[in-house]
Amino acid sequence: MKFKKIFYSIIKKNPFYKKIGKSVPVASCAQGVKLVDGSAIVNYQNDATKIIIGEKSLIEGSLIVNPYGGKIVIGKSSFIGAGAIIQSDTSIKIGNHVLISNNVRIVDNNAHETDFREREITKNQIIEHGFDSLNNRGNIEGKEIIIEDHVWISFNVIILKGVHIGEGAIVGAGSVVTKDVAPFTLVAGNPAQFKKKL
């Protein structure tokens, strides 16, 4: 909980941060989209085409597009729960009628370089000039995440880069998804493993 408070205190100082309230234009939103008060959209690229939300979707969590790349596309009638954080520097595509529960984390990249010297340089740049000063990803690896239609991601799940979750799949609470999930299957655990067909 302490990390979350620090994270949001840093984010809120960013000029590209938008705390969603009444009638705040932040992205390309179709008719009937609801952005709940307290949700957040951080679009470091300040380009509305980088965050697209389909009609009748409900966003209670946070959507973040990094300054050096990324795109988030959410289909129609999908739900992003409170405390969920979806962060992209490559591409995250979420289908129609997807349920993403509270406190889910979806990240399409490593977040940091693997070499400690490179991490130190990046960290110092962020401290001195802000996260939005990063204009390239350096050696951070990113791979597209795809979540197909009618998927249910239960609470406290982590989905890592390069994962493709097939249509109608369910990911059990607290799972860490590092590999593709077949359509109409239930996976759970750390790492997430096949449990049964649906």
Q: Each predicted region: which residue ranges?
A:
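Domain-scale signature associated with acetyltransferase and cell-envelope carbohydrate enzymes
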Residues: M1-T114, E118-Q125, F131-D132, R137-H150, ...
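Nucleotide-sugar donor-binding/catalytic module of glycosyltransferases
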Residues: H164
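A generic "structured core" feature
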Residues: I170, S175-V176
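Gly/Pro- and small hydrophobic-enriched strand-loop and loop-to-helix capping segments
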Residues: T178-F184
